[in-house]
């Protein structure tokens, strides 16, 4: 099953995340199928490609709760 979820990037103490499509069994920092945007909790910056998310949802991917919140509220 495909999941739309966050992948942590950045250094220690300065988190930053990419919104990616991955298989549900893949590790958090594993290989992503597609990048859909990013989220920086320090600067509160969030950019998400909503068109690509709609395409992936129509193909059967599921969003995690955090990505769902970012998709509805922040982007």
Curated annotation (Swiss-Prot):
GO terms for biological process: mitochondrial translation. InterPro entries: Ribosomal_bS16, Ribosomal_bS16_CS, Ribosomal_bS16_dom_sf. Gene3D superfamilies: 3.30.1320.10. It holds the Pfam family Ribosomal_S16. GO terms for cellular component: chloroplast; mitochondrion; small ribosomal subunit. GO terms for molecular function: structural constituent of ribosome. It comes from the Eukaryota. The keyword Chloroplast applies. Keywords: Chloroplast, Plastid, Ribonucleoprotein, Ribosomal protein. It is found in: Plastid, Chloroplast. Its main location: plastid. Belongs to the bacterial ribosomal protein bS16 family. This is Small ribosomal subunit protein bS16c. It comes from Cyanidioschyzon merolae (strain NIES-3377 / 10D). The lineage of its organism: Eukaryota, Rhodophyta, Bangiophyceae, Cyanidiales, Cyanidiaceae.
């Amino acid at each position: 099953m495909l999941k739309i979820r966050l992948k942590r990037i950045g250094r220690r103490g300065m988190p930053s995340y990419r919104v990616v499509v991955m298989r549900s069994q893949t590790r958090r920092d594993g290989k992503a199928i597609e990048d859909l945007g990013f989220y920086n909790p320090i600067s509160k910056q969030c950019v998400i490609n909503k068109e690509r998310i709609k395409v992936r949802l129509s193909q059967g991917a599921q969003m995690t709760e955090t990505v769902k919140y970012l998709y509805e509220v922040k982007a």
